[in-house]
């Protein structure tokens, strides 16, 4: 999975897909009451990027629904995963549950259209810290209460704050989540990051019977040398400001026979058995 990073303006979707991404990440900004308003990162952000691009969240969902719906004029077959980077650190932790309700309802109304949409992308909920876990509980409660629990099959969980992996496992256990879990490891492209935690996550992913990590990705990679390093370690995905660079690295002799781009037929919730 090549995840285009910070794809917050509607016009950026095609831009990143044209560069080779098969997944996109966008930022969800909330008001003080936990209501999702816009796709927007804000300052500071990655080096060399404009931090201020944005769109109305519901309008963004309406567009991305079309882009991921077969037979729609806007359909792009390669886009199979949507990562929602939830900016919950900007609101009170007491509002995390309200935020989870709101995002679930907006996805129901504008992406899935309560069963009337054929939009097919998988959804990854990127949660900043484990203390925000009430967002997940609310999201799942809302799908159940609204009568659309089946959409849980399309939704995965990912904690992005580089916290202790055992601490994350404990929270997933509290929530009763034993599947459909990704684990991110990384830092803004402005800084270097070691591989200790990334290696630990990959080791847990590959441990038989360990159900709290199905996929691991590294972020935000812009240098080809770091992309190569991550691929050698065996990551499932790379988040990048430059998907075209990832494509070029994947075509190199060292990686061409070991990796390929994920398609819709690849289940993002299953561990890869090479």
From Swiss-Prot:
Gene Ontology CC annotations of this record: extracellular region
Highest taxon, organism lineage: Eukaryota
Keyword ATP-binding in record: no
CDD domains: GDPD_like_SMaseD_PLD
InterPro entries hit by this protein: PLC-like_Pdiesterase_TIM-brl
Protein location: Secreted
Cystine pairings recorded for this chain: 45-51, 47-190
Key word Magnesium present: yes
Reactions catalysed, as given in the entry: an N-(acyl)-sphingosylphosphocholine = an N-(acyl)-sphingosyl-1,3-cyclic phosphate + choline; an N-(acyl)-sphingosylphosphoethanolamine = an N-(acyl)-sphingosyl-1,3-cyclic phosphate + ethanolamine; a 1-acyl-sn-glycero-3-phosphocholine = a 1-acyl-sn-glycero-2,3-cyclic phosphate + choline; a 1-acyl-sn-glycero-3-phosphoethanolamine = a 1-acyl-sn-glycero-2,3-cyclic phosphate + ethanolamine
Residues binding Mg(2+): 25, 27, 85
Keyword annotations from UniProtKB, A to Z: Cytolysis, Dermonecrotic toxin, Disulfide bond, Hemolysis, Lipid degradation, Lipid metabolism, Lyase, Magnesium, Metal-binding, Secreted, Toxin
Its biological purpose: Dermonecrotic toxins cleave the phosphodiester linkage between the phosphate and headgroup of certain phospholipids (sphingolipid and lysolipid substrates), forming an alcohol (often choline) and a cyclic phosphate. This toxin acts on sphingomyelin (SM). It may also act on ceramide phosphoethanolamine (CPE), lysophosphatidylcholine (LPC) and lysophosphatidylethanolamine (LPE), but not on lysophosphatidylserine (LPS), and lysophosphatidylglycerol (LPG). It acts by transphosphatidylation, releasing exclusively cyclic phosphate products as second products.
Protein name: Dermonecrotic toxin SdSicTox-betaIIB1aii
Organism: Sicarius cf. damarensis (strain GJB-2008)
